[in-house]
């Protein structure tokens, strides 16, 4: 499992421009991520997803996020997330540890 504090820094640097994590947080360019773990792709209420996201049909968890965050456009071709990905597995683990905590508070 990753380091939550390191993950928070990664989130602020690479994700917070487009995403919020708190309950009731607003959608920005990307969806609010609260309740992410255990939710299927393309299901955050009130966010306009591409068909690719809605139809992917996987449930978000540590393993699916580890793969997705390495190369989002490869994992979900047609996603509108314009993020290249995080190549370092340790950084992805830290980010996932943070997301697991922050999206569930």
Swiss-Prot record:
Biological processes, Gene Ontology terms: apoptotic process
Query: According to the UniProt entry, which residues carry N6-acetyllysine?
Result: 73, 100
Q: Which PROSITE patterns does the UniProt entry name for this protein?
A: CYTC
Name of this chain's protein: Cytochrome c
Family, as annotated? Belongs to the cytochrome c family.
What processing steps or modifications follow its translation? Binds 1 heme c group covalently per subunit. Phosphorylation at Tyr-49 and Tyr-98 both reduce by half the turnover in the reaction with cytochrome c oxidase, down-regulating mitochondrial respiration.
Instruction: Cite the GO molecular-function annotations of the record.
Output: electron transfer activity; heme binding; metal ion binding
Q: Which residues carry this modification: N6-succinyllysine?
A: 56, 73
What Pfam families does the record tag this protein with?
A: Cytochrom_C
* Keywords from the named record: Acetylation, Apoptosis, Electron transport, Heme, Iron, Metal-binding, Mitochondrion, Phosphoprotein, Respiratory chain, Transport
SS bond partners: none
Q: Main site of residence?
A: mitochondrion
Compartments (UniProt record): Mitochondrion intermembrane space
- Any idea which residues bear Phosphotyrosine here? 49, 98
Organism of this sequence: Cephalopachus bancanus
Tell me the function of this protein: Electron carrier protein. The oxidized form of the cytochrome c heme group can accept an electron from the heme group of the cytochrome c1 subunit of cytochrome reductase. Cytochrome c then transfers this electron to the cytochrome oxidase complex, the final protein carrier in the mitochondrial electron-transport chain.
GO CC, sorted alphabetically, is: mitochondrial intermembrane space
Q: Give the top-rank taxon of the lineage listed in the UniProt record for this protein.
A: Eukaryota
User: Could you tell me which residues carry N-acetylglycine?
Assistant: 2
In which residues is heme c bound? Answer: 15, 18-19, 81
């Amino acid at each position: 499992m990753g380091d939550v504090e390191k993950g928070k820094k990664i989130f602020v640097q690479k994700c917070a421009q487009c995403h919020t994590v708190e309950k009731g947080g607003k959608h920005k360019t990307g969806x609010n991520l609260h309740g992410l773990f255990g939710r299927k792709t393309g299901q955050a209420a009130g966010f306009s997803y591409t068909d690719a996201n809605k139809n992917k049909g996987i449930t978000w968890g540590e393993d699916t996020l580890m793969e997705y965050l390495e190369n989002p456009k490869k994992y979900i071709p047609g996603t509108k997330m314009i993020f290249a990905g995080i190549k370092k597995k340790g950084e992805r683990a830290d980010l996932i540890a943070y997301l697991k905590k922050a999206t569930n508070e």
